Regions:
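Non-catalytic alpha-helical scaffolds and adjoining flexible linkers that form interface surfaces
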Residues: 1-209
Length: 209
């Protein structure tokens, strides 16, 4: 099989022997794939940066049997601000785990990759509340996956009178269920945080850059 040129971002990096790495990469056309980066741990390796967690770049791959191998990489964005901030790194790692669960191999992941990159950009380059960013990410991802969050009733019990929005569960809750959720915000009008989360999650231009 010939070489494949694709953009991608590293979701997971694992050491393999003394000098190599096994990576999980999200690409727009191939979906989530596993690929080996030979010699990536060597100090002078051309793959040293391109094989790191959250590196987004232009990759040249080739496939042997069932495994992809990285020939070369041209890094585009490494999200440096996330790497140096523990809080930002925690949230970026959390959304990465969600992306891992939501994607598969051999499926078009263009829109999910776009959402993931835009969310990482928001975490890295802005001072927006990280819980807000996470909640909007979850709402937008659910929409991409074909799941519409409940709006008119409580996520937990189905009560119609909902007064709180859960940042943790990305949906509305009644006053009783909200007592068990520290991330629930009282809704008092369209301009409050909870409604901003919902409207941002529904807006196609949210996180666009």
């Amino acid at each position: 099989m010939g070489t494949i040129k694709t953009k991608g971002i590293i979701l997971v990096e694992r050491n393999m022997g003394d000098f190599d790495k096994m990576l999980t990469m999200l690409t727009p056309g191939l979906g989530k794939i596993s690929c080996a980066a030979r010699g990536a741990k060597r100090f002078k390796s051309s793959l040293l940066v391109g094989s790191q967690f959250l590196c987004f770049g232009e990759y040249v791959l080739y496939k042997s049997a069932s495994t992809y191998y990285i020939n070369s990489c041209e890094p585009i964005e490494i999200f440096y601000n996330i790497r140096k901030d523990l809080d930002k790194l925690k949230y970026a790692s959390h959304i990465t785990k969600i992306i891992m669960d939501a994607t598969d191999e051999n499926e078009n992941a263009y829109k999910i990759l776009q959402l993931y990159l835009n969310t990482l950009y928001m975490i890295s380059e802005t001072d927006k509340d990280l819980e807000f960013v996470l909640a909007v990410f979850k709402l937008k991802l659910m929409n991409l996956l074909g799941f519409t969050p409940q709006i008119g009733k409580c996520l937990n019990c189905g009560e119609q009178n909902v007064e709180y929005f859960s940042l943790r569960d990305s949906g509305f809750k009644c006053s009783i269920c909200a007592k068990q959720d520290k991330g629930a915000i009282h809704t008092t009008g369209r301009n409050n945080t909870s409604n901003k989360v919902y409207y941002a999650g529904s807006n196609k231009k949210s996180f666009f850059f």
